[in-house]
Amino acid sequence: MLRCFLVAAAAVALAAAAAAPARAIPFTESDLSSEESLRALYERWRSRYTVSRPAASGGVGNDDGEARRRFNVFVENARYIHEANRRGGRPFRLALNKFADMTTDEFRRTYAGSRARHHRSLSGGRGGEGGSFRYGGDDEDNLPPAVDWRERGAVTGIKDQGQCGSCWAFSTVAAVEGVNKIKTGRLVTLSEQELVDCDTGDNQGCDGGLMDYAFQFIKRNGGITTESNYPYRAEQGRCNKAKASSHDVTIDGYEDVPANDESALQKAVANQPVAVAVEASGQDFQFYSEGVFTGECGTDLDHGVAAVGYGITRDGTKYWIVKNSWGEDWGERGYIRMQRGVSSDSNGLCGIAMEASYPVKSGARNAAASNRVVKDEM
């Protein structure tokens, strides 16, 4: 169960232009040299990021003890980021982002979470509906050297799940938004909140879920409504059945990408955005700012994201373009480029090739407004 926390020279240039880092707090070694300079750096950070943190055990969120603890955590993280960026040979950088006063454990519990319990092998097997993989016959040698579904208009803006473990809903919705644009020509921003509130048979709202279960729910429910009709609140509430009955976008089902096969994942992403799971609870992922991520991570999958493209840098490093749900002030304006092709038949970096799936939509059919059945809110 995911608790949470995604060529030619011209294509390379376009990818570089789209990879600008989010705004972060710049600092130098001198900012770490004394208590006074560290306090000044911390206040600069606090003036940028107004975020609410869980109180320390037994304390109050704004008392002196908790404030001191937050400062100490910030200092440790700032020093880690500085030392990591000083090391050579890493094609990515870290930054003091909005998570800079959170311990790794707090970050994991709030934005990542319940790890390997979600694996499909523990939830009824693999293969999606019918066990097929429609892109299996595609010739790998004939795939485009780079794909970016953002540039094809099939990706909505970056969203922010907040302190709610609903990454699975954002991953699901990104994939459905993408295939709907490809099949109908319409990019519609869809409702994660409907999934959080209403898809409660197998998924657990802010306490985690699986993208495959969410695809099943959308099909079974007859579609999914829009973000504007059922806005996101970053908390689980009572299902608004009247709003959820507005089936603005439909799918026919879903399929799973063969596990541990980056070649198969590339074939799928060449055709549509794909829901994927990664391990995102390490410090390098927490503070990622820009570049091709090659940082420390394992395969305890704890975060749902969407693979919305792939490419290659000028120096030949292959990468995935991954849409996250932590807001535009994380990573490359909400995205992360993750190293691709780590090894043949591998799990992929951070397990990205282990649990990928995508929605199936055969044509331009969506529910018409005239056919909507509005039910009483319950």
From Swiss-Prot:
This is Cysteine endopeptidase RepA. Belongs to the peptidase C1 family. Its EC number is 3.4.22.-. The keyword Signal applies. Residues 1-24 form the signal peptide. It is an enzyme of class 3 (hydrolase). One of its GO terms (cellular component) is protein storage vacuole. SMART domains: Inhibitor_I29, Pept_C1. Disulfide bonds join 164-206, 198-239, 297-350. Pfam families: Inhibitor_I29, Peptidase_C1. One of its GO terms (biological process) is proteolysis involved in protein catabolic process. GO terms for molecular function: cysteine-type endopeptidase activity. It comes from Oryza sativa subsp. japonica. Induction: Induced by treatment with gibberellin (GA3). Residues 25-141 form a propeptide. It is found in: Protein storage vacuole. The keyword Acetylation does not apply. The active site is at 167, 303, 324. CDD domains: Peptidase_C1A. Cysteine endopeptidase that digests in vitro both the acidic and basic subunits of glutelin, the major seed storage protein of rice. Keywords: Disulfide bond, Hydrolase, Protease, Signal, Thiol protease, Vacuole.
